[in-house]
């Protein structure tokens, strides 16, 4: 069968699984997947309609506001169609861009696999496994207008170019530069590629890789910590190329060099050097040394079962087994390092799935060979045939044996193994009908604010838990106390866990709160699906030492309970103004 047809089938599969929730997204408007997407669109709306990208926003962390520090590339990409054709075009483009990037990433996996093994069947299997991996789907699903899809695409493009010969290695620095302009954490993925390159390449190739890292170091002009990090990685690789020259005399020279480099980083971490505080910040980020990170689902550590499920279930197990047979040190190094990252924070499974797909595809290929479905053997024979410039009759006869039914059986085998992946990859839309109605009501019924001017402090704010902050900001066009950036989260947590109305109203006055929004999932209404323990943790309570019964008893004495469960009937300064199923809106009165 024509490999182009099979690749097209993989692409169509990747599109299909990523087009979930189409009806929810285009439901009487345009909605997005997740939470962070909404703040990106808030920035894009200001950029398109007001012709500037704000570096400060009074509509979050009200009334203090918050500085916008992350790189702007992704926002400018989303805003570009709007600058030409109006904001509505950016709204639509933002819905489909992650899917486009996801499909391109699938193609890059295929090309990378070809670069590593030079076998089309192996490459197609790699692409299919990556296309089905739950975490790869979640990051590139329809409406997921967040920077992750772009970062992963650029990471894959960098890896692919590094694996090519000659000057292509230097060009790998270009996608790394774009990655640096899209995510402040880009040096983490740059380091992952650098360590993998050091282990895999010889000294000559390593010098080209080192040169490529000077390109993203240019980002120093806009983001000095990022630029310095990439320059440090370039130096690390250049010195590594020198060390490689001594491997004939000192067998483990590279290993000692890596150990020495890690020790140097640790020294920088523990010694208070003002100019290198970003190193400490980066390490703390990786290890999740932050009060907020343990309360974020994707930032949890040591989630081994979730790592397995997010990376492909049985396919991830295949990857672990394949480590015993696979010989490409670039892929093996990337797998082990990204696995360590994923153990530190679950979010890094987005990069772990890359080597995992390649490794599992290799084991699947070996199994197919044992079942007399030619994969590597067929490629070898075809190569010999091309060299002889004539078709060997035996090869031709063997190729003819691989008919449609054989391909169909193999495809069915791969799909059956991928069923758990597909089931997990399809997730309910975050924004329920109750929330859509509540957000639209707030947009049209509450006092209007000058939403498009983030530099002007509005008259009031809306208190909610941080998960809903960006929804309220973008859809309802109202200022919020806290959103997914965690600023304001402590006050929000203390407000909801307050044991007296007086305590809650003091926080409300401090934060200029006029309305409060609650939902079932932040209460203890369903103990198996609740955000309340996370709220308690942010408020300063040690939830780990409490039983479920103690947490429930604590909840029953909070202002959140008296608001959401009792509809504020026994409160003086709050009254229920509107209810939309699971979502309730209260007004602060007499404050």
Swiss-Prot record:
Motif DKi motif, chain ranges: 521-535
Source organism: Archaeoglobus fulgidus (strain ATCC 49558 / DSM 4304 / JCM 9628 / NBRC 100126 / VC-16)
CC cofactor: Mn(2+); Mg(2+); Zn(2+)
The family this protein is said to belong to: Belongs to the STT3 family.
Membrane topology according to the record: Multi-pass membrane protein
Swiss-Prot/TrEMBL site (Interacts with target acceptor peptide in protein substrate) positions: 36, 298, 531
Motif residue range(s): TIXE motif: 295-298
Parts of the chain on the Extracellular side: 27-67, 113-121, 169, 241-252, 297-303, 345-347, 430-591
Record protein name field: Dolichyl-phosphooligosaccharide-protein glycotransferase 1
Cytoplasmic compartment spans: 1-5, 89-91, 143-147, 191-219, 274-275, 325-327, 369-408
Catalytic activity field: an archaeal dolichyl phosphooligosaccharide + [protein]-L-asparagine = an archaeal dolichyl phosphate + a glycoprotein with the oligosaccharide chain attached by N-beta-D-glycosyl linkage to a protein L-asparagine
Transmembrane segments annotated in the record for this chain: 6-26, 68-88, 92-112, 122-142, 148-168, 170-190, 220-240, 253-273, 276-296, 304-324, 328-344, 348-368, 409-429
Subcellular localization(s) per the UniProt record: Cell membrane
Record motif WWDYG motif, residues: 465-469
UniProt short sequence motif DXD motif 1, positions renumbered to this chain: 34-36
Annotated region described as Interacts with target acceptor peptide in protein substrate, given as residue ranges: 465-467
Pathway: Protein modification; protein glycosylation
Binding-site residues, a glycophospholipid: 147, 347
Outcome (variant: residue 521 to Q): Reduces catalytic activity
Molecular functions (GO terms): metal ion binding; oligosaccharyl transferase activity
Record's comment describing the protein's domains: Despite low primary sequence conservation between eukaryotic catalytic subunits and bacterial and archaeal single subunit OSTs (ssOST), structural comparison revealed several common motifs at spatially equivalent positions, like the DXD motif 1 on the external loop 1 and the DXD motif 2 on the external loop 2 involved in binding of the metal ion cofactor and the carboxamide group of the acceptor asparagine, the conserved Glu residue of the TIXE/SVSE motif on the external loop 5 involved in catalysis, as well as the WWDYG and the DK/MI motifs in the globular domain that define the binding pocket for the +2 Ser/Thr of the acceptor sequon.
């Amino acid at each position: 069968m024509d490999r182009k047809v099979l690749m097209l089938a993989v692409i169509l599969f990747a599109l299909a699984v990523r087009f979930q929730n189409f009806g929810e997204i285009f439901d009487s408007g345009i909605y997005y997947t997740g939470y962070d997407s909404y703040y990106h669109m808030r920035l894009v709306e200001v950029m398109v309609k007001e012709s500037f990208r704000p570096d400060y926003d009074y509509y979050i962390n009200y009334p203090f506001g918050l500085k916008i520090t992350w790189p702007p590339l992704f926002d400018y990409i989303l805003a570009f169609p709007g600058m030409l054709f109006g904001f509505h075009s950016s709204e639509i483009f933002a819905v489909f861009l992650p899917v486009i990037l996801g499909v391109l990433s699938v193609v890059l996996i295929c090309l990378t696999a070809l670069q590593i093994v030079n076998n089309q069947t192996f490459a197609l299997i790699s692409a299919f496994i990556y296309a089905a991996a739950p975490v790869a789907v979640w990051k590139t699903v329809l409406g997921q207008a967040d920077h992750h899809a772009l970062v992963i695409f650029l990471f894959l493009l960098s890896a692919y170019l590094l694996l090519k010969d000659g000057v292509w290695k230097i060009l790998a620095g270009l996608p790394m530069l774009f990655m640096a302009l899209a995510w402040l954490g880009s040096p983490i993925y740059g380091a992952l590629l650098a360590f993998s390159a050091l282990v895999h390449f010889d000294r000559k190739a390593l010098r080209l890789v080192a040169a490529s890292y000077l390109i993203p170091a240019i980002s120093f002009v806009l983001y000095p910590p990022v630029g310095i990090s990439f320059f440090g990685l370039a130096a690390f690789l250049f010195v590594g190329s020198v060390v490689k020259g001594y491997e004939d005399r000192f067998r483990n020279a590279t290993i000692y060099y890596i150990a020495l480099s890690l020790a140097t980083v640790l020294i920088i971490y523990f010694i208070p050097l003002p100019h290198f505080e970003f190193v400490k910040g980066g390490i703390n980020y990786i290890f999740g040394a932050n009060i907020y990170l343990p309360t974020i689902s994707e930032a949890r550590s040591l989630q081994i079962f979730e790592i397995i499920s997010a990376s492909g279930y049985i396919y991830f197990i295949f990857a672990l087994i394949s480590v015993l047979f696979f010989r490409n040190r670039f892929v093996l190094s990337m797998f082990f390092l990204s696995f360590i990252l994923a153990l530190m924070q679950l979010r890094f499974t987005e990069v772990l799935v890359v080597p995992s797909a390649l490794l599992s595809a290799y084991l699947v290929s070996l199994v197919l060979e044992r079942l007399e479905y030619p994969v590597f053997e067929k490629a070898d024979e075809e190569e010999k045939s091309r060299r002889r410039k004539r078709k060997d009759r035996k090869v031709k006869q063997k190729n003819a044996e691989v008919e449609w039914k054989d391909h169909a059986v193999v495809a069915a085998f791969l799909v059956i193994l991928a069923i758990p992946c597909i089931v997990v990859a399809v997730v309910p839309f975050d924004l329920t009908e109750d929330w859509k109605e509540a957000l639209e009501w707030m947009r049209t019924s509450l006092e209007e604010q000058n939403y498009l001017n983030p530099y002007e402090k509005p008259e009031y704010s809306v208190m909610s838990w941080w998960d809903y902050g960006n929804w309220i900001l973008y859809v309802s066009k109202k200022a919020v106390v806290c959103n997914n950036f965690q600023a304001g989260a402590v006050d929000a947590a203390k407000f909801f866990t307050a044991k007296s109305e007086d305590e809650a109203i003091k926080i409300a006055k401090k934060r200029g709160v006029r309305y409060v929004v609650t939902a079932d999932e932040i209460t203890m209404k369903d103990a198996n699906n609740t955000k309340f323990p996370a709220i308690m943790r942010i408020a300063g309570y040690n939830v780990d030492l409490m039983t479920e019964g103690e947490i429930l008893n604590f909840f029953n004495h909070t202002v959140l309970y008296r608001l959401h469960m009792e509809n504020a009937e026994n409160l003086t300064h709050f009254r229920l103004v509107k209810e939309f199923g699971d979502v309730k809106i209260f007004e602060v009165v007499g404050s």
